[in-house]
Curated annotation (Swiss-Prot):
Pfam families: Anticodon_1 (PF08264), tRNA-synt_1 (PF00133), Val_tRNA-synt_C (PF10458)
Lineage: Bacteria, Pseudomonadati, Bacteroidota, Flavobacteriia, Flavobacteriales
Role according to the record: Catalyzes the attachment of valine to tRNA(Val). As ValRS can inadvertently accommodate and process structurally similar amino acids such as threonine, to avoid such errors, it has a 'posttransfer' editing activity that hydrolyzes mischarged Thr-tRNA(Val) in a tRNA-dependent manner.
Protein name per UniProt: Valine--tRNA ligase
Species annotation: Christiangramia forsetii (strain DSM 17595 / CGMCC 1.15422 / KT0803) (Gramella forsetii)
Family annotation (CDD domains): Anticodon_Ia_Val, ValRS_core
Length: 876
């Protein structure tokens, strides 16, 4: 069957992905081989493929395919995350578009809509990953809301509660007024914004005097319950024991003393609003102050907001400033740079809010996780993230794990009374009934008497169990799969979730398995555009990944992504990289077509040039294999690709095939051809992890194969000793061939015309590749001489000199004139360099590196002048 003249990526990709799936190559079962396990960072169930996913999953697929080739039992577990906040927001928006308010639905009715949405839109991203070539074990696909996954989450919550690590507390939390839920500290992004500092006047009760406070949030004065001064501040001695009156609401509040107050900030007087600032809450607890919450869940003002009730906080800010000014309570307004917290999920400005929430104590759980990473039990790649990790973990705060959402794992706390502590925690309702009966002493208590906590658990509370729960390691901690596949080998993820997810998985691993969840954490960079901007929908600078695959092929896009993606460093994405990857695909395909197009003869002896070429490439291949293995061991995936790329493009296509190809219209000997095919197959093996489709296509085109002989499960090349000498010898020969080609090109000497060639072998260079030089330079006669050759052009390679007689081939006088011009220019250049180097001030004061460069220029110019003079002499 004829080989297609052009590579059809779409056709090839569909064909081989279906073939791999049909033959179950991606599936893993427990056996006696060494396992290699990766769990996918589960994308949001309703998400779609973006460039970050492309990079992350390409790297994972490279690692998994290489492990498979190395004979390991490769298991890559895919799945999706239920993404409470994001998914609920989408469902609420959908319902709103249909004229349905979430608040008009029961929880069960809302969840029915959420599940319908998830079934309709969920998992699209996993299908998209198949277009990339991801070789996940799709039979193992998990979803964080699967029954067994949910049961694992609930079991862990109950266990941690019984250990005293999970508790319910009335705390200041981060409130997202758009999503109407709490967020953990790690889900809040802080940014500096230009704002205002308002100086407000509070009347001192019983006098006509005023004190002034400075605040960035004048709307919160309606929740003030004290003014605080520093007891050491002599300016306010007269205020001790007095009271102040809050403007607008006319509430009388005490003036308290506490050294917490910074005497240098603002006016030195601090308004205390315990419901809306964590530090104020601490002061309030210390001084037994009232707590007045002025906000509704959507950050509009409630009835404590008086005539501002129902208005948004920022609208109220503007209006209350006008009112304060109108009644003479506004002293002045200053520009002020303020640090503002925003929701990572919605972008809304976070509102500190007091609320009953569930928390997980982290300090104790963090200790083994700190030790594991700092003690090299777990490796972070690159290591630059170690300090970030250590800082986070050593300053860890209790994790707020409850969210005011319906979509997610409902907290398994059941209330049997109206008191805050009238609850039991249990895995099931039936167990809760039994516990509640025991606690209350009421044997008649029924399930209908219990009310389950309405809140859901933070999404991360399910995904922190991911490496264990995908193998059912929580519900059945001794099952054969968790014992075999856990701990996993590598985790490939983004640095921005190093604490959100990675650190928490490590904590969970030590808590529930007593060991690490993975050995290595490869932290990818952020995909940015050429202007270094993060790719985003809002900027419109993110290309459609599937569109790129359609245009350049999956292999081309994979190569393009990896060519510039060193671990932990941001990738400056340029579509030209995908174009380069596509060009590489075509290069490989055309090289294969060239090889398959040769006529083979069993009667011809193997030429010595072919034998040398095979020996050289075999050594070069083995040297590259060592480089590649070293890169892989250090997770320098981009470097491993580049080594492979150069080997195949430069050494195989540009040199090796040219060295062995037969003359025009002539057949090739069978022995050489067999070696060429064997070499090609080895090339395909090391290239397969990066470019799975084109390599499988060529592998299957070489000869008919059974499913057991597919490239995807072939054997990775074995490292062997290699001849370094032959590599060095060919390196010299390649420079000689390049010199011959340059002269042919510069002097318009057709390659069809044979030339004589003389060598002044000052270096006593080996003659190993003389036959190759003759073949690739179309040299009729190669001889060694002891002196310069008259009437010849010459060039140097290191200290050797090479001569090509040009009698009758070129216009000698014109050539002499050209050489003289180049000689004059080079001598002038040398004078300018000498002048610089003779300047003692320059030599003594310039950086050593700069002086060294100038000296190198001088040496190069002198060598060139000598060669040009020799060429002139030979033409005389």
């Amino acid at each position: 069957m004829a080989i297609a003249s052009q590579y059809n990526a779409k056709k090839v990709e569909d064909k081989w992905y279906d073939y791999w799936m049909k033959n179950n190559y991606f599936h893993s079962e427990v056996d006696d081989r060494e396992p290699y396990t990766i769990v996918i960072p589960p994308p949001n169930v309703t998400g779609v493929l973006h460039m970050g996913h492309m990079l992350n999953n390409t790297i994972q697929d490279v690692l998994v395919r290489r492990a498979r080739l190395k004979g390991l039992n490769a298991c890559w577990v895919p799945g999706t995350d239920h993404a409470s906040i994001a998914t609920e927001a989408k469902v609420v928006a959908k319902l709103k578009a249909e004229g349905i308010d979430k608040n008009d639905l029961t929880r069960e009715e809302f969840l029915q809509h959420a599940w319908e949405w998830t079934h309709k839109h969920g998992g699209i991203i996993l299908q998209q990953l198949k277009h990339l070539g991801a070789s996940c074990d799709w039979e193992r696909t998990k979803f964080t809301m699967d029954d067994d996954m949910s049961a694992s989450v609930i079991k862990v919550f109950v266990d941690l509660y019984e250990k005293g690590l999970v508790y319910r507390g009335y705390r200041m939390v981060n409130w997202d007024p758009q999503a109407k839920t709490t967020l953990s500290d790690e889900e809040v992004n802080y940014e500096e914004r230009n704002g205002k500092l308002y100086h407000l006047k509070y009347k001192i009760d019983g006098t006509e005097d005023y004190l002034t406070i400075a605040t960035t949030r004048p709307e919160t004065i309606l929740g003030d319950t004290a003014i605080c001064i520093n007891p050491n501040d002599e300016r306010f001695t007269h205020l001790k024991g007095k009271k102040a009156i809050v403007p607008i609401c006319n509430r009388t509040i005490p003036i308290i003393e506490d050294e917490y107050v910074d005497m240098e900030f603002g006016t030195g007087c601090l308004k205390v609003t315990p419901a809306h600032d964590e530090n104020d809450k601490n002061l309030g607890d210390k001084h037994d102050l009232d707590v007045i919450d002025i906000f509704n869940d959507d950050a509009t003002l409630n009835n404590y907001g008086l005539h501002y009730e129902g208005k948004d906080r920022f609208v109220v800010r503007a209006e209350i400033v006008e009112e304060l000014e109108l009644y003479g309570f506004l002293d002045k307004v200053e520009d002020h740079i303020n640090k503002v917290g925003t929701s990572e999920r919605t972008g809304a400005v976070i509102e500190p809010k007091l609320s009953d929430q569930w928390f997980l104590k982290m300090k104790e759980m963090a200790q083994p996780a700190i030790k594991a990473v700092l003690g090299d039990d777990i490796n972070l790649v690159p290591e630059k993230f170690l300090n970030t990790y250590r800082h986070w973990m050593e300053n860890v705060r209790d994790w707020n794990i409850s969210r005011q959402l319906w979509w997610g794992h409902q907290i398994p706390a059941y209330f049997y009374g109206k008191g805050k502590n009238d609850f039991v925690v249990a895995e099931t309702l039936n167990q809760a009934v039994l516990k509640a009966r025991e606690v209350t002493g009421n044997a008649e208590l029924q399930a209908s008497d219990l009310t389950q906590d309405k809140d859901a658990l933070d999404t991360w509370f399910s995904s922190w169990l991911w490496p264990m729960s995908v193998f059912n390691g929580i519900l059945e901690p001794e099952n054969k799969e968790i014992e075999y596949y856990y701990p996993t080998n590598d985790l490939v993820t983004a640095p921005e979730i190093l604490f959100f997810w990675v650190a928490r998985m490590i904590m969970a691993g030590y808590e529930y398995r007593g060991e690490r969840p993975f050995k290595n954490v490869y932290l990818t960079g952020i995909v940015r555009d050429k202007q270094r901007r993060k790719m985003s929908k809002s900027l419109g600078n993110s290309p459609d990944p599937l569109g790129l695959i359609e245009q350049y092929g999956a292999d081309g896009v994979r190569v393009g992504m990896l060519l510039s993606s060193p671990a932990g460093n941001d990738l400056m994405f340029d579509e030209d990289l995908c174009k380069q990857g596509s060009g590489f695909t075509n290069k490989i395909w055309n090289a294969f077509r060239l090889v398959k197009g040769w006529e083979i003869s069993e009667k011809i002896e193997q030429p010595e040039t072919a034998k040398m070429a095979i020996n050289w490439y075999t050594a070069r291949f083995q040297k590259t294999i060592r480089e590649i293995e070293d890169h892989y061991s250090k997770y320098r995936i981009s470097d491993a690709l580049m080594s492979t790329y150069k080997l195949i493009w430069d050494d195989y296509c540009s040199w090796f095939l040219e060295m062995v190809k037969p003359g025009y219209g002539e057949p090739m000997d069978a022995k050489t051809y067999k070696a060429i095919i064997a070499i090609l197959e080895e090339n395909l093996k090391i290239l397969h992890p990066f470019m799975p489709f084109v390599t499988e296509e060529i592998w299957q085109e070489i000869t008919e194969r059974t499913p057991e002989e597919a490239l995807i499960i072939a054997k990775w090349p074995v490292e062997k000793e290699f001849d370094e000498t032959i590599i060095k010898e060919f390196s010299h020969a390649a420079e000689v061939i390049a010199g011959v080609r340059k002269i042919r090109k510069d002097k318009n000497i057709s390659f069809k015309n044979e030339i004589d060639f003389s060598v002044l072998n000052n270096e006593n260079t080996s003659k190993t590749f003389d036959g190759v030089i003759s073949k690739m330079g179309n040299i009729s006669n190669l001889e060694y001489v002891t002196g310069s050759v008259d009437g010849a052009l010459s060039f140097r390679v290191r200290s050797n000199e090479y001569f090509i007689p040009i009698a009758g081939a070129i216009d000698v006088e014109a050539e002499k004139e050209k050489i003289q011009e180049e000689l004059n220019y080079t001598e002038g250049f040398l004078k300018s360099v000498d002048k610089k180097l003779s300047n003692e001030r320059f030599v003594n004061n310039a950086p050593e590196k700069v002086v060294a460069i100038e000296k190198a220029k001088k040496a190069d110019a002198e060598a060139k002048i000598e060669a040009l003079k020799a060429s002139l002499k030979s033409l005389s």
